[in-house]
């Protein structure tokens, strides 16, 4: 997703004290892409595979013919019911890169550790991370709820770092590296959810240049994370949004 430049809307509106309020419109993107499928990478064209799992056994063992199987493009996929029953899987336990789906765990830790009206201040590290962003600037201040919107709707890497710094300091007030503290908590939370094939190395999912590493997950683990995230009212409301405005107090 290309980097966004989000113009100021409220410079013409006078605000309290000397702060200028800025409203940033967030383009819908990542929220619509979240599903219980980790299709990384997608195969060229849809495929029907009799080796796919159907309720615990492969389709060929169940004598299910190709015309009765789903025709999907994903290399790795899983269909899980609300009760955790797995109805369908393709390479569901294969460890793959999940990119911005990483932000689901970032959101989980945020809603579990924060009140939605807490204030988050955007650091230089957050504002300059680049790639897909919510257009946050160094010194900006916004609520946790607004930062979650910046995280999930345009898949904002800036919001991911800002939240990781904020939550990391709450988890360990004495930490000298709040992001590292947050990432450690991400991995611990994943294990508690039963995610056996997941390793996080940052809060946004970037995996090149200074962010290159061995982060990975599986379609099955992504399903477990999504199942947990969807229990939260705020998360459900945010990912259901097609468009959103966030109000930011500029430095």
Go through the PLM ranges and name each one.
Residues 34-43:
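C-terminal segment of classical bacterial N-terminal signal peptides
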Residues 9-30:
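Bacterial N-terminal signal peptides that target proteins for export
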Residues 226-251:
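Extracytoplasmic
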Residues 36, 151, 238-239:
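A generic structural signal for nonpolar/aromatic side chains embedded in well-ordered alpha-helices
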Residues 1-9:
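N-terminal targeting leaders characterized by basic, low-complexity, disordered sequences
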Residues 3-4, 19, 23, 47:
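Preference for long, amphipathic alpha-helical scaffolds in soluble/luminal domains
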Residues 46-220, 230-233:
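Active-site-adjacent loops and short helices of periplasmic peptidoglycan-processing enzymes
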């Amino acid at each position: 997703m290309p980097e966004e430049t989000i113009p100021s809307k409220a410079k013409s509106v006078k605000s309290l004290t000397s702060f200028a309020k800025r409203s940033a419109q967030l383009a819908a993107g990542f929220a619509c892409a979240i599903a219980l499928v980790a299709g990384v990478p997608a195969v060229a064209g849809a495929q029907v595979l009799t080796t796919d799992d159907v309720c615990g056994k492969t389709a060929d063992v169940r004598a299910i013919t190709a015309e009765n199987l789903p025709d999907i493009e994903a290399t790795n996929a899983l269909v899980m019911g609300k009760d955790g029953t797995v109805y369908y899987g393709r390479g569901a336990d294969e460890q793959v890169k999940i990119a911005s789906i990483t932000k689901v765990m970032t959101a989980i830790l945020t809603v579990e550790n924060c009140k939605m009206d807490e204030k988050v201040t955007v650091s230089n590290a957050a504002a300059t991370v680049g790639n897909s962003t919510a257009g946050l600037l160094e010194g900006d201040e916004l609520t946790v709820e607004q930062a979650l919107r910046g995280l999930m709707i345009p898949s904002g890497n800036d919001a991911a770092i800002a939240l990781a710094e904020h939550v990391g300091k709450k988890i360990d007030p004495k930490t000298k590296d709040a992001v590292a503290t947050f990432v450690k908590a991400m991995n611990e939370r994943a294990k508690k959810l039963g995610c056996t094939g997941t390793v996080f190395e940052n809060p946004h999912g970037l995996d090149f240049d200074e962010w290159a590493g061995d982060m990975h997950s599986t379609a099955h683990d992504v399903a477990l994370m999504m199942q947990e995230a969807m229990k939260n009212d705020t998360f459900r409301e945010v990912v259901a949004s097609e468009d959103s405005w966030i109000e930011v107090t500029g430095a």
